[in-house]
UniProtKB/Swiss-Prot annotation:
This is 3-methyl-2-oxobutanoate hydroxymethyltransferase. 3-methyl-2-oxobutanoate binds at D42, S43, D81, K109. NCBIfam families: panB, PRK00311.1. The keyword Transferase applies. InterPro entries: Pantoate_hydroxy_MeTrfase, Pyrv/PenolPyrv_kinase-like_dom, Pyrv_kinase-like_dom_sf. Catalyzes the reversible reaction in which hydroxymethyl group from 5,10-methylenetetrahydrofolate is transferred onto alpha-ketoisovalerate to form ketopantoate. Keywords: Cytoplasm, Magnesium, Metal-binding, Pantothenate biosynthesis, Transferase. It catalyses: 3-methyl-2-oxobutanoate + (6R)-5,10-methylene-5,6,7,8-tetrahydrofolate + H2O = 2-dehydropantoate + (6S)-5,6,7,8-tetrahydrofolate. Binds 1 Mg(2+) ion per subunit.
């Protein structure tokens, strides 16, 4: 899988599938099943390390897990998250992004919009592929007042649209849209020539991502609205992954019950 193929998917209308992975074993299963993208996510702070948020994930953590996933996945496009405070300025961002690329990432992802213009541009100038992340931004959960849907009011929605257009103009290859109204995600997706990957953003994004642990029902307590357990009706993990891929490709997931 490569960036050109993702762009072709957008043009043809075929949906892009994405799951998180943190180790070689899960990555190899997802890869064999034909997942399009594997995100080595800083969500490992929640599901691997047991934290309440992603803020304590370090660059060393991300490099370690990127190396592990790379050993298991050779076909899917590998995207690695840049963790909290790893891109506070453009030079720091470039240094840390290069560490993830050396570890095996083919693209790096970081949260935020126009406030990171310098980092987006320095990546573009250094030919480092970038995935953006707009809407709910887990690394800013404290500043944003908790985990909640973004883009419900006009000011917030306008900012998401403005940021998305700016990111595309600065060479960003893909944008994740998290927890925004489905109609806003549709508007953003239709306004861009690059693919969007939704999580809690409705069926009209160009692709869908879930945290793999959520997709497999490995959670206790609160479960976000956008999550579906694909293992519960499947016999094993491979079958669950195949069911997720099929549901995304045929647009039966996410349904209205998973959208805002």
């Amino acid at each position: 899988m490569n960036i050109e193929a993702l762009n072709n998917f957008k043009q043809s209308g075929e949906k892009i599938t994405c799951l998180t992975a943190y180790d070689a074993s899960f990555a190899s299963v997802f890869d064999v099943c034909g997942i399009d993208i594997i995100l080595i996510g800083d969500s490992l702070g929640n599901v691997i390390q047991g934290g309440e948020n992603t803020l304590n994930v370090s660059m060393d953590d991300m490099v370690y897990h990127t190396k592990a996933v790379t050993k298991g996945a050779q076909n899917a496009l590998r995207i690695s998250d840049m963790p909290y405070q790893s891109y506070t300025n453009s030079e720091q961002a470039l240094t840390n992004a290069k560490l993830l690329i050396i570890a095996g990432a083919q693209m790096v992802k970081f949260e935020g919009g126009c406030e990171h213009e310098a980092s987006f541009k320095i990546f573009q100038n250094n030919d480092i592929p970038v995935c953006g992340h707009l809407g709910l931004q887990p690394q800013s959960v404290i500043e944003m007042g908790g985990y909640k849907t973004e883009g419900r009011d006009k000011q917030s929605a306008d900012k998401i649209i403005k940021d998305a257009l700016a990111l595309a103009s600065w060479g960003v290859k893909v944008i994740v849209l998290e927890c925004i109204p489905a109609n806003l995600a549709k508007q953003v997706s239709q306004s861009l020539s690059i693919p969007t990957i939704g999580i809690g953003a409705g069926v009209n994004c160009d692709g869908q991502i879930l945290v793999s642990y959520d997709m497999l029902g490995i959670h206790v307590g609160y479960v976000p609205k956008f999550v579906k357990n694909f293992l519960i009706d499947s016999g094993d993990i491979k079958s669950a992954v195949n069911a997720f891929i099929e549901a995304v490709k045929d647009k039966s997931f996410p349904g209205e019950q998973h959208s805002y």
